[in-house]
């Protein structure tokens, strides 16, 4: 279906007009019907008159402007330059281009949610691939438009649900395709999530191998945020495998720690016998906002660490078990699997202490890649 035929149809219905009322003096009813159903391409003059009657503005200048804007947007998207894409579109009134075919591109590029399914018949392959990504159907997006960006989105989606093998395959493909085309930001993001995927499986050598590439790329791009991110993830992985002193050195030297980095510092201090320093970190964290995760969940995670510090016999307290289980369930529901994996040792510790061996085994089966 032709998009402009679709928009004429939708706008006519929105005004509760008949076909005869809209096309009077412009064209025949049968011709309008064919235009609306995509069976006929209207002449420029007929299209202009129909749109004008519907109070929709479209001329060659507007259409060219919209097309150029959309193509620049697609280039930014497929290059992974999302900040530049946002800057490009946020200053534009996309509804100004509503009567142009490029409105679909601009709306998809700026949307956080999928468009109405009824409009999919008007979409080309590229647009439909973006629609599928917004719908959470990344596999279908890859089938429609197999490029570095769609493979990256597929890899990230698989990573978030803990499907690490398929995630690694998609992310490696994304990196390879991006490297051929010089899409550095896609290369960077693919390597970040490759490192994350191996880190969540406690495969530290492979995590560090991918993060080393990330480090080189990020330094070249002067991307301090990414350099912090891989440092944070590396130190968090050290906690998971018991390298508490190394993790402590990294978290304790941060000049501007976040709430979650203070949470990790408190755990390092807990594990290395620095109780007072752990409490200081918790006190500071509790006064901060959480940018990384939901604030109420972050406070619950801090409460868990404080409980263990306040009560050395915490494994005999039902209150601790209830708080732990609530936090773990929220982590599984609300966040990528890595957050739950990080807290898995405390869950298993609780189940074993309370002789809930069946639940401990079920949890181990749910996270088979976790080494304890």
Predicted feature residues:
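Residue register of alpha-helical TPR repeats
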Residues: 67, 105, 130, 149, ...
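DNA major-groove recognition helix of helix-turn-helix/homeodomain DNA-binding modules
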Residues: 43-61
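Short alpha-helical DNA-recognition segment
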Residues: 15-34
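A short, Lys/Arg-rich alpha-helix, primarily the initiator
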Residues: 1-14
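Structural motif corresponding to the intra-repeat A-B loop/turn of tetratricopeptide repeats
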Residues: 79, 161, 201, 221, ...
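Amphipathic alpha-helical segments of tetratricopeptide repeats
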Residues: 90-95, 139-140, 172-183, 212-222, ...
């Amino acid at each position: 279906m032709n998009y402009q035929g679709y928009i004429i149809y939708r706008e006519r219905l929105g005004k509760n007009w008949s076909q005869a009322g809209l096309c009077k003096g412009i064209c025949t009813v049968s011709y309008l019907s064919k235009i609306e159903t995509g069976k006929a391409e209207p002449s420029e003059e007929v299209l202009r008159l129909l749109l004008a009657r519907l109070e929709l503005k479209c001329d060659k200048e507007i259409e060219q402007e919209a097309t150029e804007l959309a193509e620049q947007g697609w280039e930014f998207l497929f290059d992974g330059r999302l900040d530049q894409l946002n800057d490009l579109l946020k200053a534009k009134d996309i509804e100004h281009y509503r009567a142009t075919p490029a409105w679909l591109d601009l709306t998809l590029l700026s949307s956080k949610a999928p468009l109405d399914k009824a409009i999919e018949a008007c979409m080309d392959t590229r647009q439909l691939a973006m629609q599928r990504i917004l719908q959470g159907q990344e596999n279908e997006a890859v089938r429609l438009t197999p490029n570095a960006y769609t493979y990256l989105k597929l890899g990230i989606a698989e990573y978030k649900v803990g499907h690490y093998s398929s995630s690694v395959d998609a992310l490696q493909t994304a990196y390879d395709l991006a490297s051929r085309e010089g899409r550095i930001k896609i290369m960077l993001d693919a390597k970040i999530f490759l490192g994350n995927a191996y880190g969540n499986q406690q495969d530290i050598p492979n995590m560090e191998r991918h993060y080393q590439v990330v480090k080189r790329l990020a330094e070249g791009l002067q991307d301090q945020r990414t350099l912090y991110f891989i440092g944070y993830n590396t130190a968090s992985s050290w906690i998971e495998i018991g390298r508490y002193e190394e993790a402590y050195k990294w978290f304790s030297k941060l000049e501007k720690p976040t709430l979650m980095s203070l949470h990790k510092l408190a755990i390092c201090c807990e594990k290395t016998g620095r109780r007072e320093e752990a409490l200081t970190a918790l006190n500071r964290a509790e006064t901060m906002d959480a940018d990384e995760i939901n604030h109420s969940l972050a406070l619950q995670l801090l409460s868990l660490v404080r409980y263990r510090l306040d009560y050395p016999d915490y494994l005999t307290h039902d209150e601790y078990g209830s708080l732990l289980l609530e936090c773990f369930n929220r982590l599984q529901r609300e966040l990528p699997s890595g957050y739950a994996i990080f807290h898995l040792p405390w869950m298993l510790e609780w189940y074993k202490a309370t002789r809930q061996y069946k639940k401990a085994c079920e949890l181990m089966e749910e996270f088979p890649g976790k080494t304890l």
